[in-house]
Amino acid sequence: NQLVAARKGSPLVVGVGTDEYFIASDATPIVEYTKSVIYLNDYDIAIIKKTELQLKTLKNEPISPKIEKLDIDIGEIEKGGYEHFMLKEIFEQPSTLVNTLRGRITADHSDIHHGGILEIIPKIVAAKRLIIIGCGTSWHAGLVGEYLFEEFARLPVEVEYASEFRYRKPVIYEDDIVIAISQSGETADTLAAIRLAKENKALVIGICNVVGSSISRETDAGI
């Protein structure tokens, strides 16, 4: 009648329903049942009984739960009549691009708005170098970004595969800007690279699709 869950490294989420609880590695499987979640930090322990939830540290110290509300539409995580998710995402690309730009570019194309980075624009302007990190197709997106940033912003750019970046000793300066790209916001190697960049005092910006994901919470700003 008791379930114990602990986090170390990989993400862990507790869904809070009415006299019921859910455990998952991210929020998407939970949203069908509840939009109230608790994100555990490393070394947090969740002790779950039928109608009771306790959060503790490894030292058995109690933790006050911080319940967050998910801003996810269940329709976004269903296949929508397609045979599989990859096919759905391929055919959704035109509408996805339009939705990405909607509300961010003025009607006359004279200005661009990114609310998630407004407070750090002075640091971005003062940056001497940009480091883009990601895995898989996120890394490929970073390679495209490299051409655009260097052509239009005239800013030196390095694109790094997160799983390689985290295991060497990269030279990172405080005036560097690190952009972490991840569709899920939970890519383990990218998360580790983010933490390495923050240890070296670099400003980290996250680009991901999932609000409330680990990357969206651990970066300094996000898009």
Please name every model-derived segment.
Residues 125-223:
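Glycine-rich phosphate-binding loops that contact phosphosugars or nucleotide phosphates
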Residues 1-124, 138, 147-152, 165-171:
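N-terminal segments that mediate ammonia production and transfer
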